[in-house]
Every structure is written in C-alpha cells, then in structure tokens.
Amino acid sequence: MAGSLKKLAKAESCRLMQEKLESWSKDYEINSCDQNLNQCCELIEMTSVIQGQLFTILNETSRESGHYAGVDTIKTRLLPWLGTWFSHATSGRLFETGLFLNQDSTETERKLRQLATSQTLQLQDLQEELTSTRLELNHVQQDLAQTQLALEDTKTQLATTLLTAADEIIQLRAVLKASRAQEEDSLRRLDHLNDCEQQIERLRDELSILDAQKSVLQSRIARSRSPSPRRIRSRSPSPLPLRSCSPGRARSTNASRHAFLVARFGDIYSKDRFDAERILRTYISDMEMVQRIIYTAAVESFHAAKMAYRQFKMRVRKTLSIGHSGPESLEDTVMDYIVRHEDLYDVQASVNEVIRSMNINPKISSTPECDFAVISSFIRELCRVAFSMQTLTPPLDVAFGMDGEFFSETKYHRSVDSDYTAALVAYHVWPALMENDVVIVKGEAVTKRGALWSHRSRSRSQNRSRSVSPLLSHLSRSR
C-alpha cells in the first residue's frame, strides 16, 4: 500500500489537474463550446485515474487490516457518498444533460438551416449585384470609348485652332510692327512739325524786330534827306511795332509778377515736390537720397535757367541795339521784350542740362531702373519759374547750401526728422529763396549730430573723383 501511495504522490496528478483547472477558468470565456467540453472531459479522465488509484489504495489498506477492519469507516463515509452521487448522477443530471444536449442539437440544426438559407439568399443577391455591375461596366466602357473618340476629335480641332491662332499671331505681330513703325514715323514728323513751328515763331519775332529796325532806318533816312529841321520834327517816327503795350511794362508789372512767382515757388515746394518724391520712391527706397535728388534738381534748375536767361538776354540786346531809339533805355526795351516773349525760352534745353548735371553729381545716385528724367516735369516747372524770376527787378535766386554748414534759423526750417539740438546741417531738403541776400521764403534742412565729419569724409571722396570742389563750382556758376 505504501508503494502505491508514494507512486501517486510522485505522479503529481493532483497538481497538474489544479493547473488545468486554473487555465480552463482563465480561458473559459474565450474558448469555444467544443474546447470547454474537451477540457471538462480531460479533467474527468484525470479524476477517474486518480479515483482508480485511490480505490486501489483503499482495497489494499482494507486487505492489510483484515476482513472486518475499516467496515465502520466505509459505511459511514464511502457508502453514503457513493449512493448520493449515483442517485443524483443517474436521476437528475444525466437526464438534464441529455435534454440539454438534445435541445442544443435541435437549436444548432435550426441555426444551421437558417444560416444556409441566408447564405443562399446572400449568394443570390451577390450574383444579381455582380450581373448589374457587369452591365454598368459595359455601359461605362461604351461611354469611355465614346469619350475617347470625342477627345480625339477635340484634339484635332484644338490643333487646327492653334495653327490658325499661330498664323493670326504672326499676322498681328506684323501689323503691330508696321503700326509701331508708322507711329514712330508720325512722332518724328510731329517733332519735326513742332520744331518747324518753333522756328516759324522765332522767324516771326525776328521779322517783327526787322520791321521795327526797317521803320527806324526809313525814318532816319527821311530825316537825313529833309532840308528843314521843322519838317524833320514833323516826321517823327511812329512807335516801334515791337512793343504792343505801354512803355515800362516790365517795371509796372514787377510787383504783381513778384507776388505770383513767390506763390508759385511755394506751391512747387508744398505740392509738386511731394509728387516728385512719390515718383522717386517707387525706384529708390532711401528717403534721404530722394530728398537730396529733389534739392539738387531745384538748385540745378535755377542755375540752368539763369544761364539760359543770360544768353537769351544777350541775343535780344544784340538784335534791338541795331535800331533802338525812343524815350526808354535799351535795357528797359530788352526787359519788356523778354517779359512779353517768355514763351520763346527753350525750357527743354535747360531740362536736359539739369539732368546732365545731376548725372555727374557725386552726392546723388540712382538705381539702374530709374533715370532722373522721371521727374522731368518737376524740373521743367522749376526752370520756368526760375527763368521768370530773372526778369524781376531785382531778380530772385536760391541760396547756396553746403552739407556741414551751421544751421541758420533765418534761412531754413528744420525737418521733422532732425535733431533739434544739432547745430550743423546734415543735408538740405529745399533751398531758400533770396532777394538781394535777403530771405523771402525759408528753405528746409535736416540737422544731425556728426554732420561735419560725414561732410568732410564725403568731401574727400568727391575731391578724389572731381577736379573742382563743389564750392568752387558754385562760385564759377554764380559768376
């Protein structure tokens, strides 16, 4: 008996059965019905093996004790348990298990029949859907074939249209080229006509002057041939046809022209200057450089207008001095003529001279995309005003300004971005208008600390690039 017991203990059947019970308990919810039944049957088999070994040990133990040894224990413990288990197993649980299995098999067969029916229906639906899909696919293939044919036709039409458009573009380019050539020819003719008209006007003025000279000469010849002084006095010449107004017109209108020109100079500063700045700012981002360009344009415009006025005055004096006679002096006659014929001033030549001077000025620079001609209308208006100011008595001129000079409260206003504690001018924004060294309209300047040193460094670089300093250049211009 002891050997059988030791063998059972070493077999560890109970421990293995416990592990299988725990594993089954964990996997019960995820296992299928067949897997759970297999697990249960396996445990029953293990239990029956262990029970068989225990009954063997029970028989051997009772045999070793004698025929009647352990009878009481078997009666009180084993027989009641066996009776209870067999009664329950045979009467209740086996019946319930059989009934449950019958019901389960019936339900399973019913579900299988339903599943087979549903699968048959699904298969029929799938076949019908497949048939309809095939029909739709055939329609789509037919539509695709028609679309491809239409696409080929469209490509052919598009190629034809492109060829036609290319021919039209070539023809239009030829027409455009011819139109541009015709336009350029028309512009050249128009310029030639303008030049001819200007020449005609000049010739008319010269003819009027020559007529005046002719009348003067004829009167002199008549006086020289007259025998008596009394007849000479009676044949005094008529007024020159050159003057269509009263004598001394320039002197009589000097005050009104002075007020008008000063007001126009202020309008250029307050309106036209900002228009020119807006044009330059589209090409130049540096505001200081833009203001320097505007100031240089104003100064150069006055210089070019003064030079043109001197040349124009010399020509008029030379022409009128030949046959001048009358109560007025030659200077008054010349001034009257210039005031009446300011339209003969060749302002475009002065504009070209200003732009040429600005291009060689080392203090200002421009971008490759920008030319100073973009503000030619601003320069033209300045030249006209400056030329008219030279006909005043006394004439008006702009003040000379230089970077690094001491700021003058009587001559300039400070710009809004100035350092109001600085005493030196960094650069000028607008020139002051002078009359006999007296300021009548203030200019505008920017004051900053350290302007003298920056001016000296710029002056050294300018001296290396130019043979004449700006001061000497200004003095030579004023002469």
From Swiss-Prot:
The keyword Cytoplasm applies. GO terms for cellular component: cytoplasm; cytosol; intracellular membrane-bounded organelle; mitochondrial matrix; mitochondrial outer membrane; mitochondrion. Keywords: Coiled coil, Cytoplasm, Lipid-binding, Membrane, Mitochondrion, Mitochondrion outer membrane. Disulfide bonds: none annotated. InterPro entries: MIEAP (IPR026169), MIEAP_C (IPR031981). Residues 109-161, 187-223 form a coiled coil. Pfam families: MIEAP. The keyword Membrane applies. Residues 235-249 have a biased composition (Low complexity). It is found in: Cytoplasm, Cytosol; Mitochondrion outer membrane; Mitochondrion matrix. One of its GO terms (molecular function) is cardiolipin binding. Residues 220-251, 456-479 are annotated as: Disordered. It comes from the Eukaryota. GO terms for biological process: mitochondrial protein catabolic process; mitophagy by internal vacuole formation. PANTHER family: MITOCHONDRIA-EATING PROTEIN (PTHR21771:SF0), MITOCHONDRIA-EATING PROTEIN-RELATED (PTHR21771). Belongs to the MIEAP family. Key regulator of mitochondrial quality that mediates the repairing or degradation of unhealthy mitochondria in response to mitochondrial damage. Mediator of mitochondrial protein catabolic process (also named MALM) by mediating the degradation of damaged proteins inside mitochondria by promoting the accumulation in the mitochondrial matrix of hydrolases that are characteristic of the lysosomal lumen. This is Mitochondria-eating protein. It comes from Gallus gallus.
